[in-house]
Curated annotation (Swiss-Prot):
Its main location: cytoplasm. This is IQ motif and SEC7 domain-containing protein 3. One of its GO terms (biological process) is actin cytoskeleton organization. Residues 572-581 have a biased composition (Acidic residues). It comes from Homo sapiens (Human). The keyword Secreted does not apply. Residues 63-78, 1061-1087, 1147-1157 have a biased composition (Pro residues). Pfam families: IQ_SEC7_PH, Sec7.
Length: 1182
């Protein structure tokens, strides 16, 4: 046998490189912090200077010349006459003292100047050329100082006009930081300090009685015209965005204050109400209740809106036209603002180029040692193709290179360790000490218990050990305590401690005292595909997954399981078949974070080798890497529950429910999928899921990634663009590749965020292209212009004579490159390529639904929504009377089954219509019941009963099929779709109840039972929890590791025959709980106990000397929680003392897995020795 230490040495070398990368990133962060401190210092100086100017101006206003003070009874229109003189005299003391000439506004000859505190903050940064722009800063007269000051005192502090009063309450540092941290799309800081929202500003300004100037009333047309210039054509859609024009008018650098007549227009404009028709609920309107309506109620609400606005066709056409025009107008307006800001050099730097790293002595020494290590093992350096080939050249800001290098290193570590452990397992298999068991069928007993017994059995026997154990039972003295974390598995053996991924097979004490664990497929993907039914073993779900992964690693029995599990019940539609098959095939992508960061960085082995010093040095890097991994933060921990799934069918159903939730609300869908363990809770894992999984709407992917309010979404977007390689591609072709995965449309802010991230990545991949421009932000402007061009060119609402021409496109990009023009041949090439081929996203499941919808005549229900998926299409025959024989050809129906809807169509004659189908009726699946029937007339019949919305009546439909196979296939798909939509509705109701009632305290739940069974009766989860509540609660021990680890409850008591639960002792008639003797503490926890956890905060790696000292502490820590856990379980008020316990006879169900933020519980291994087999072949702990 070859040397087994060769590949671990490679892993150590890879970890050294990983540590060096982390150190480089830390040094870069330190440098950036120093720069930030320097910027803050300069900002404080600038704020202090502005403060002194403002105080001096206030002093001048407090003591004006006597001739300039008008009488208090003077009318307000007389103010403009004296305002220029007042402003001119106010400037003289400033110029005499040597202050900047731009500190005070220069009066215009024809109108009074207006002053705002935002103008004072920006003036020190402007050059001499700012004189022309300074008088146009809106909002306030400086004339009639006394009258204006009285007006300011009467106004509330939230009004825009109270700029001077607000400045008195703000420190200079706060004012300066507000300017620095403003959003890029805000060109001025008019509303940074005084207005919470633009609507409030406009409303208050419109209600004012003359304090706000009317000089800006004529700016409305200029705002619309400026936005139309960005699109390269006259202002066609200006009336549709009139309300937003008035709302955002004050934010433009040259716009005046809102006129008093703008108030009624702002309130009565239909432009604010019509877009709500397409979305059913206006996102900006203050909602009276946060309760989320169900899908049928939302559809009913849209139907009522359509009826209110003139019917289905008229209202929908108007809503689509208005929404499209308004979004295009907003994009054009944003582009105009960004372009003007760039021309005036006021746009903050968006695209940051990587900088060359200066080599230090430490970095050179580390690189040299790493080079020697690679030469020792004969491996080439792993480098990203987008990075320069020189080793000491340009390791830079690590915004993209850090991720790429970590991925490559993680893959190399996994390969090295899996190769080594494969040799070890094969050698053990040859010696007869290790056996593999093929995955059984769904009806047979799960291999979880047997696999669990085989894993310690193969790990336990070393030289001279006795391996004769009863099959299916774990050995009594295996000497291990395994904690299967969500991302990391820590195995504490008698002689060492090893850390590896949670989806690894432990082969402990192999070849002496070495501990080896083989990384394999992540558990999430295995459970989705259903290649193994190890999830059915409630006592050890992690071990069952590990053994299934071991079977794959040795390539023995995974083929049959993959063939059985990869086929979903819904195979009529190709998209659905690919979706369910991909669930198991792409497991690496679904848990890519585990493979690339978590599992690779936690693969440190404390093996007997000559490289113990290097291994110990990498332990610190391992711990730091684990702690520094960004995680998804669950906003509602009560909804982040992870129930155990006993069957593959239920697992697949929950996965589809997660996809539906994502297509309805992306944030909730990601939260659901993470809590159920389908995807990792790290940005890179979610990024792989979004890029490589089918069943996700491209539109909703863009909605999720464009949400800049949440840091996690921004991190996922960065990881998504890092996965794309735009090297040696034209900008429009790279944008085409980006938009193929993500649909870039919707709100202007989200589109801008997506384009910004794309531009950043493009600059990283093509530094030679960026060098052709004066400013890297030109790439961002050009990409934004390409999106506008594509929208304008292919929008059906724009007439051909109004579409953007080549000269318009060139004129829009004139002078954006720091005053220089983009080369004409580059712009012409982009325009011609966009004209030849549209930028559009790849097909998704909505594409097939849209094709079906276009082929239907008379369809009132909107089919093409992001969450709707076509399941199957069957040809059935409608039966009007089941007791009469009828001609089947006269009632032939094409039944399209969607995941939430059943659409019944009939074929159209080809001569009369170009369409394929005529709409008959559509019924929802929620609440639907079906029953098969057979009589002398119809041998394969089915009856559908659907409740009518808003009524207690029910609709009954009868169908029959020609053959039993077709009917059986339709019934299976229908049954699964009804269960899916019912479970989805139950989950929605549970979330809403938790949101309305607040987060439920888990301490009031009986011994780890999750949720309130009364709120979800009838669901599979409720049945499991009902059985769990009546199980014995004795011999449970609570373990808390940093208050973040979680586990499932393992019960040790024996149940009655056929799963009849035994009532807990505290529920039987007994004296009060105060008089019951306390439960004795259990003995120290023996080894061989499995504890499943959900999340890990800190990993402590111990060597042999430390282990001897830690074992008594560990046993003491486990035993100290016995009384408190038993007391909490016994004191739960399940029923009054002496109340009878209702015993129900039902098959045992596995306990739910750990929820987040729940006490860590496990049971000593004695309870795992009693497995009872039932007639169904399944095993249970009861």
């Amino acid at each position: 046998m070859e040397s087994l230490l060769e590949n671990p040495v490679r892993a150590v070398l890879y970890l050294k490189e990983l540590t060096a990368i982390v150190q480089n990133q830390q040094s870069l962060i330190h440098t950036q912090r120093e720069r930030i401190d320097e910027l803050e210092r300069r900002l404080d100086e600038l704020s202090a200077e502005n403060r002194s100017l403002w105080e001096h101006q206030q002093l001048l206003q407090a003591q004006p010349p006597p001739g300039l003070v008008p009488p208090s009874s003077a009318p307000l229109p007389a103010a403009p006459a004296t305002a220029p003189a007042a402003a001119a005299r106010a400037q003289e003391p400033l110029q005499d003292q040597g202050q900047r000439s731009a500190a005070a506004p220069h009066p215009a000859p024809d109108r009074p100047p207006r002053q705002h505190h935002g103008q004072l903050l920006e003036q020190p940064q402007r050059g001499p050329g700012s004189r022309a722009h300074t008088p146009q800063s809106p909002h306030k007269h400086l004339g009639t100082q006394g009258a204006v000051t009285d007006k300011e005192k009467e106004r509330p502090p939230s009004c825009c006009a109270a700029a001077g009063a607000l400045l008195q309450h703000k420190s200079p540092s706060a004012l300066g930081k507000g300017v620095l941290s403003r959003r890029p799309e805000n060109e001025t800081v008019l509303h940074q300090f005084c207005c919470p929202a633009a609507d409030a500003c406009s409303d208050l300004a419109s209600q004012s009685d003359g304090s706000c100037t009317q000089a800006g009333g004529g700016m409305e047309d200029s705002v619309v015209a400026a936005a139309a210039v960005a699109a390269g054509r006259p202002s066609a859609h200006a009336p549709k965005a009139q309300a937003q024009e008035l709302q955002e008018e004050e934010e433009r650098p040259g716009a005046g204050a809102a006129s008093p007549r703008a108030g009624p227009q702002h309130k009565a404009s239909p432009g604010r109400q019509q877009p709500a028709l397409a979305t059913a609920l206006c996102p900006h309107a203050p909602a009276a209740s946060d309760y989320e309506l169900s899908l049928d109620l939302k559809n009913k609400q849209i139907e009522m809106l359509e009826h209110k606005y003139g019917g289905h066709l008229v209202s929908r056409r108007a809503a689509c036209t208005i929404q499209t025009a308004f979004r295009q107008y907003q994009l054009s307006k944003n582009f105009e603002k960004i372009r003007n800001s760039l021309l005036e050099s006021r746009l903050p730097r968006r695209i940051s180029l990587r900088k060359v790293r200066s080599p230090t002595a430490e970095s050179l020494a580390a690189e040299k040692a790493l080079m020697e290590g690679y030469g020792l093992v004969g491996l080439p350096l792993v480098r990203s193709p987008s990075l320069p080939p020189t080793f000491a050249g340009t390791l830079t800001e690590l915004e993209d290179s850090f991720t790429e290098q970590v991925q490559s290193l993680a893959k190399s570590i996994d390969d090295a360790l899996s190769t080594w452990s494969l040799k070890t397992m094969c050698s053990l298999r040859e010696s007869g000490a290790y056996q593999l068991h093929q995955a059984l069928q769904a009806a047979a007993g799960p291999p979880g218990l047997e696999a669990e017994g085989r894993a310690p059995e193969s790990a336990g026997p070393g030289p001279g050990d006795d391996a004769a154990e009863t099959p299916g039972l774990p050995p009594a003295h295996s000497g291990t305590l395994m904690m299967a974390f969500r991302d990391v598995t820590v195995q504490i053996a008698n002689q060492n401690i090893s850390v590896s991924s949670s989806t690894a097979l432990s082969v402990a004490n192999c070849l002496g005292a070495q501990t080896v664990q083989a990384p394999a497929e992540p558990a999430a993907g295995k459970a989705e595909q259903g290649e193994t039914s190890g999830r059915e073993a409630p006592e050890a779900p992690a071990v069952g997954r590990e053994d299934a992964s071991a079977e794959d690693s040795c390539a023995e029995a995974a083929a049959s399981g993959a063939a059985d599990g990869a086929t979903a019940p819904k195979t009529e539609e190709e998209e659905e078949e690919e979706e369910t098959a991909e669930v198991g095939r792409g497991a690496e992508a679904e848990a890519g974070d585990l493979e690339q960061l978590s599992s690779s960085s936690t693969s440190t082995k404390s093996a007997k080798s000559g490289s113990e010093a290097s291994a110990s040095a990498s332990k610190d890097a391992l711990q730091a890497m684990i702690l520094s991994l960004p995680r998804y933060h669950c906003e509602n921990p009560a909804s982040c529950k992870s129930p155990t799934l006993s069957t593959d069918t239920l697992r697949k159903r929950l996965y589809r429910i997660g996809l539906n939730l994502f297509n309805i609300n992306p944030d909730k869908g990601i939260q659901f999928l993470i809590s159920r363990g389908f995807i990792p809770d790290t940005p890179i894992g979610v990024a792989h899921f979004l890029l490589q999984r089918k069943g996700l709407s491209r539109q909703m992917i863009g909605e999720f990634l464009g949400n800049s309010k949440k840091q996690f979404n921004r991190d996922v977007l960065d990881c998504v663009v890092d996965e794309m390689d735009f090297s040696s591609m034209e900008l429009d072709e790279a944008l085409r590749k980006f938009q193929a995965h993500i649909r870039v449309q919707g709100e202007a802010q989200k589109v801008e965020r997506l384009i910004e991230a794309f531009s950043q990545r493009y600059c990283m991949c093509n530094p030679e292209v960026v060098q052709q421009f004066h400013n890297p932000d030109t790439i961002f402007i050009l990409a934004f212009a390409i999106i506008l061009l594509n929208t304008d060119m292919y929008s059906p609402n724009i007439k051909p004579d109004r579409k953007m021409m080549l000269e318009d496109f060139i004129r829009n990009l004139r002078g954006v490159d720091d005053g220089a023009d983009i080369p004409r041949e580059l712009v012409v090439g982009i325009y011609e390529r966009i004209q030849q081929k549209e930028l559009k996203s790849n097909e998704d499941h909505v594409t097939y639904v849209t094709k079906v919808e276009k082929s239907i005549v008379g369809m009132k229900t909107v089919l093409s929504v992001p969450h709707r998926r076509l399941v199957c299409c069957s040809r059935l025959f409608e039966v009007t009377d089941v007791n009469k024989l009828q001609k089947q050809a006269a009632h032939q129906r094409e039944v399209f089954l969607f995941n939430d809807l059943l659409v019944i169509l009939k074929l159209c004659p080809k001569k009369k219509s170009s369409s394929t189908y005529t709409f008959c009726k559509s019924v929802g699946l929620l609440g639907m019941q079906f029953q098969l029937f057979e009589n002398e007339y119809y041998s394969h019949g089915i009856t559908l009963v659907t409740p009518l919305s808003g009524s207690e009546k029910k609709q009954v439909l009868h169908f029959c099929a020609l053959g039993s196979d077709e009917m059986q296939k339709f019934v299976e798909d229908l049954k699964e779709s009804i269960a899916e939509v019912t479970e989805l509705e139950q989950i929605r109701i549970e979330w809403e109840l938790e949101k309305q009632q607040g987060t439920k305290t888990l301490s009031f739940k009986p011994c780890g039972a999750q949720g309130d069974p009364q709120s979800k009766q009838g669901s599979p989860t409720a049945k499991r929890e009902a059985a769990l509540r009546e199980r014995p609660a004795e011999s449970t021990v609570e373990v808390s590791i940093h208050n973040r680890l979680q586990t499932s409850q393992h019960n040790s008591g024996l149940g009655a025959e056929r799963g009849a639960p035994v009532p807990p002792p505290d529920l039987q008639p007994s004296p009060p709980r105060q008089q019951t003797p306390p439960l004795p503490p259990p003995p120290p926890t023996p080894p061989g106990t499995l504890v499943q956890c959900q999340q890990i905060v800190k990993v402590i790696v111990l060597d042999k000397p430390c282990l001897a000292r830690m074992e008594p502490l560990l046993s003491q820590a486990l035993s100290c929680y016995t009384s408190s856990s038993s007391d909490s379980c016994g004191s739960t008020p399940l029923g009054g003392p002496g109340s009878p316990v209702k015993v129900t006879h039902q098959p045992p169900l596995p306990p739910p897995p750990p929820p987040y933020n729940h006490p860590h519980q496990f049971c000593p291994p004695g309870s795992l020795l009693h497995g009872h087999r039932y007639s169904s072949g399944s095993r249970s702990l009861v």
